[in-house]
Amino acid sequence: MSTTTTASIEGYKLGKVIIEGKTKQVYDLPEQPGLCLLLSKDRITAGDGVKAHDLAGKAEISNTTNGQVFRLLNEAGIRTAYVKQCGAKAFIARKCQMIPIEWVTRRLATGSFLKRNVGVPEGYRFSPPKQETFFKDDANHDPQWSEEQIVSAKFELNGLVIGQDEVDIMRRTTLLVFEILERAWQTKNCALIDMKVEFGICDDGNIVLADIIDSDSWRLWPAGDKRLMVDKQVYRNLASVTASDLDTVKRNFIWVAEQLADIVPKKDHLVVILMGSASDISHSEKIATSCRSLGLNVELRVSSAHKGPEETLRIVREYESVMSNLIFVAVAGRSNGLGPVVSGSTNYPVINCPPVKSDNMQVDVWSSLNLPSGLGCATVLYPEAAALHAATILGLGNFMVWSKLRVKALNNFITLKKADKELRGVRNA
């Protein structure tokens, strides 16, 4: 596609149409190198475009839905091409070359999976979620491909050849994207049944989640009830399509967009870092920095359980009275009375993270480990470990904290994959 336009959207001058699909156009942005603009259409299709109808307002709804989805994924730390919304019907994205593979993740067996896997009952639950890949080819109805076929195709995009390492990265990322959105929708008592995503390769050679994620991309069942579905399957199931039917589909899509806008990660938690002395500030700040990187709210206080036990307990009661999701991190060297005293006085989790040094570690850490019976505080040595432990606890009730932890693990996996790929190979003497 090489048509050009002189139009602009929200001050962004549109260049040539890079590609046009059934429901969107992708424009070059000549004044914004490395970026492009995706403009949605008021169009709904199914069956590789065999069924298609105009649907006034769909472009705006789709764009809003997509923006809310990528808001959550970007906040979690997933690497995406999405930059920002641009007007009612468009958004700005990093320019990338798309990998022609559609990644599908399924929590429950339904739809085309049942036709391809005769004998599997509808509603069969996949744990972990089932993953499938399809080669994007409308003429052949997007045939299912194996992992071996993807690797053997040797797609080369922006200088990167898609091999086993890249497939592994996309597979892990796809699964995590599904699980993040699944947990987000659980806060609205909605079950994410399955969804599809695509990836692209940016100019820097990195794999990013790309394209659009909207109500065309998933199956969504409120209260886990298929009869209440609010996704494009409602349109797919129509033998004949009336204006009233299209209005129902549109109302469903609006409902989805409104629910997504209301999914806001909770901030009803606090990690209180209690240090026995102001001299422990450096160690405590490292804990706080790690906590904030995981989306945790933090406060730092100074109180000595040895020199001022009454004040220590007053501080504990102060936070207990205003916060239900609360964790105390005790930072005290030498004889650590702070953590055990707090642990014996509260039902909230207490994590000891003493600022020990290599020359006195075995002596000083013992007071945090050899505790009287009835105390359940944990002990870690490193600031990041204290933050990770706190996040693991709070993530049980906060999907965004849980998501940030999982993304951190994913990024570790990707870093190791890339390092191994770079160093791999036989070295002769």
Swiss-Prot record:
It comes from the Eukaryota. Residues 7-264 are annotated as: SAICAR synthetase. Residues 7-264 are annotated as: SAICAR synthetase domain. Keywords: ATP-binding, Decarboxylase, Ligase, Lyase, Multifunctional enzyme, Nucleotide-binding, Purine biosynthesis. Residues 270-429 are annotated as: AIR carboxylase domain. Homooctamer. This is Bifunctional phosphoribosylaminoimidazole carboxylase/phosphoribosylaminoimidazole succinocarboxamide synthetase. It comes from Drosophila melanogaster (Fruit fly). The gene is Paics.
